[in-house]
């Protein structure tokens, strides 16, 4: 789902994207190198994470605990939002596992969203700002 959504987002030409995927790094790098998408094979550092306005977790639920632990102690910008499309993982999962995350949103896209024709359900925590809600609405 993550790759398909990225394809749809690239067609919007509104944002630039970086992808972190240690498991599929080579294939993604080959696929997206012409689209100016930066592909990384390791978790960003604390200083690198501060450059992101939106962090989207689009991973399989069975690896969620392992992946999220790598972000556990990061300090995020106050206006950054962490979005998740991980099946079955509620906002509380992120609140418990990423202690410095402030703005959180759970997104449930449907398949037509992959071609910018669908609807997505968003639920954010109480800190999820209207400004970030507009950004998330645009990409989902």
Residue positions per predicted region:
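Hydrophobic alpha-helical segments typical of transmembrane helices
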Residues: 5, 24, 63, 90-93, ...
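Internal alpha-helical scaffold of NAD(P)-dependent oxidoreductase catalytic cores
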Residues: 48, 93-103, 119-140
């Amino acid at each position: 789902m993550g790759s398909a959504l990225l394809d749809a987002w690239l067609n919007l030409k509104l944002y630039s994207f970086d992808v972190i995927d240690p498991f599929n790094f080579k294939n993604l790098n080959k696929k997206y190198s012409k689209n100016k998408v930066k592909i990384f094979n390791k978790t960003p550092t604390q200083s690198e994470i501060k450059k992101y306005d939106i962090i989207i977790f689009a991973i399989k639920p069975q690896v969620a605990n392992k992946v999220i632990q790598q972000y556990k102690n990061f300090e995020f910008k106050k206006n950054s939002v962490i979005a998740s499309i991980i099946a079955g993982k509620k906002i509380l999962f992120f609140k418990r596992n990423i202690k410095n995350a402030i703005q959180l949103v759970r997104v449930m896209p449907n398949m037509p969203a992959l071609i910018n024709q669908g609807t997505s359900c968003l639920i954010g925590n109480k800190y999820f700002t209207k400004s970030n809600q507009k950004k998330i609405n645009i990409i989902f």
